């Protein structure tokens, strides 16, 4: 390791986008799922 004057510059910083196709797919499924779980949980407390 004679090349010690270059301190760890091989790692390039990558900025990833937030809104991707995967993000849209996950939230398109997760948001209604949480809504329906809340609705089903609320139905358990309805007394007739």
Swiss-Prot record:
Binding site for heme: 27
Keyword Iron: yes
Record's subcellular location: Cellular thylakoid membrane
GO molecular function annotations of the record: electron transfer activity; heme binding; iron ion binding
Major location (coarse): membrane
Domain of life, per lineage: Bacteria
Any one Gene Ontology BP term: photosynthetic electron transport chain
Cofactor(s) demanded: heme b
Gene Ontology CC terms, in alphabetical order: photosystem II reaction center; plasma membrane-derived thylakoid membrane
Cofactor binding description: With its partner (PsbE) binds heme. PSII binds additional chlorophylls, carotenoids and specific lipids.
Family: Belongs to the PsbE/PsbF family.
Function in brief: This b-type cytochrome is tightly associated with the reaction center of photosystem II (PSII). PSII is a light-driven water:plastoquinone oxidoreductase that uses light energy to abstract electrons from H(2)O, generating O(2) and a proton gradient subsequently used for ATP formation. It consists of a core antenna complex that captures photons, and an electron transfer chain that converts photonic excitation into a charge separation.
Stated name of the protein: Cytochrome b559 subunit beta
The encoding gene: psbF
């Amino acid at each position: 390791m004679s090349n010690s004057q270059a301190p760890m510059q091989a790692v390039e910083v990558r900025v990833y986008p937030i809104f991707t196709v995967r993000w849209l797919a996950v939230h398109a499924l997760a948001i209604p799922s949480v809504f329906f779980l809340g609705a089903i949980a609320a139905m358990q407390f309805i007394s007739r």
